[in-house]
């Protein structure tokens, strides 16, 4: 039985992850965390997310070290915010807990802190901007298109619900990084355009963020050539698409001894070569 800790437990992703874990035969939630001084501290997490009692009281982030020592989870799943995630990773890694990290919006310095904590404590982690299985097929397809159509004009458009705090999305940035690594020419990211921008430069990859309504996550990459264009789109209609990938990542990382992995590793996509 895989024992799982969840931070951001009452958030949109955290609550859905907990619900789905309770439906699995090979894993269980042993502790769940929210922000310090949360008014629901101590209440049963299952009741708070509407699935009935599961025997796990809501803890707060300032108790993370103590509760991890008491419950001894195999994996901690983090969908919080960047600065909180960095601290959670440091504490979990020191306790020998493997990690599934879906938080986005990190600075380069924060990414380095996370990698350092994982490596220094010899734990294993799956880190991904998007755990949806379809999105990762989308990413793999982008590798192919960027290699074949790298000289086309490339634009990325993403849209999310009005509550999303960071822009552009981690998924859009990951798409841009994949294209940059595979298109065969130097690339620069251009975030939106306004005013007299001048003629579009060949090396540009445009990235545009839209916010509104209850959109779970839409991503489109446009490869525009002379007389034709290809548009590759992924639309998530439910957060369950992401949660299903998280469950696979938990199983993948639970017994790993060390190392940093991504969803391509989890899904076996690194074996596909173009």
From Swiss-Prot:
Keyword vocabulary terms for this entry: Amino-acid biosynthesis, Cytoplasm, Diaminopimelate biosynthesis, Lysine biosynthesis, NAD, NADP, Oxidoreductase
GO BP terms, alphabetized: diaminopimelate biosynthetic process; lysine biosynthetic process via diaminopimelate
Binding site for NAD(+): 8-13, 34, 102-104, 128-131
Signal peptide: none
Pathway listed: Amino-acid biosynthesis; L-lysine biosynthesis via DAP pathway; (S)-tetrahydrodipicolinate from L-aspartate: step 4/4
PROSITE patterns: DAPB
Location (main, coarse): cytoplasm
Amino acids binding (S)-2,3,4,5-tetrahydrodipicolinate: 161, 170-171
InterPro entries, per the entry: DapB_C, DapB_N, DapB_N_CS, DHDPR_bac, NAD(P)-bd_dom_sf
GO cellular component annotations of the record: cytoplasm
Annotated GO MF terms: 4-hydroxy-tetrahydrodipicolinate reductase; NAD binding; NADP binding; oxidoreductase activity, acting on CH or CH2 groups, NAD or NADP as acceptor
EC number(s) per entry: 1.17.1.8
UniProt similarity note: Belongs to the DapB family.
Function, as annotated: Catalyzes the conversion of 4-hydroxy-tetrahydrodipicolinate (HTPA) to tetrahydrodipicolinate.
Protein name stated in the entry: 4-hydroxy-tetrahydrodipicolinate reductase
Organism: Methanocaldococcus jannaschii (strain ATCC 43067 / DSM 2661 / JAL-1 / JCM 10045 / NBRC 100440) (Methanococcus jannaschii)
């Amino acid at each position: 039985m895989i024992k799982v800790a969840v931070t951001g437990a009452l958030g949109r992703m955290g609550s859905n992850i907990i619900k789905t874990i309770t439906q699995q035969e090979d894993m269980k939630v042993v502790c769940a965390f929210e922000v310090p001084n949360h008014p629901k501290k101590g209440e049963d997490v299952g009741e708070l997310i509407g699935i009935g009692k599961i025997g796990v009281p809501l803890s707060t982030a300032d108790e993370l070290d103590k509760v991890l020592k008491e419950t001894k989870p195999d994996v901690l799943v983090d969908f919080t915010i960047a600065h909180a995630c960095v601290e959670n990773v440091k504490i979990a890694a020191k306790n020998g807990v493997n990690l599934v990290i879906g938080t986005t919006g990190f600075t380069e310095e924060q990414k380095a802190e996370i990698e350092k904590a994982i490596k220094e404590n010899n734990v294993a982690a799956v880190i991904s901007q998007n755990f949806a299985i379809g999105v990762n097929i989308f990413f793999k397809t982008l590798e192919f298109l960027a290699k074949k159509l790298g000289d086309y004009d490339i634009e990325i458009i993403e849209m999310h619900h009005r509550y999303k705090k960071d822009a552009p999305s981690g998924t859009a940035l990951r798409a841009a990084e994949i294209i940059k690594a595979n298109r065969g020419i130097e690339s620069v990211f251009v975030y939106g355009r306004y005013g007299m921008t001048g003629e579009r430069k060949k090396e540009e990859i445009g990235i545009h963020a839209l916010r509104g309504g209850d959109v779970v996550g839409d991503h489109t990459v446009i490869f525009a050539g002379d007389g034709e264009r290809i548009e590759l789109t992924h639309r998530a209609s439910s957060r369950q698409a992401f949660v299903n990938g998280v469950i696979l990542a938990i199983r993948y990382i639970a017994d790993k001894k060390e190392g940093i992995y991504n969803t391509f590793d989890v899904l076996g996509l690194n074996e596909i070569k173009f």
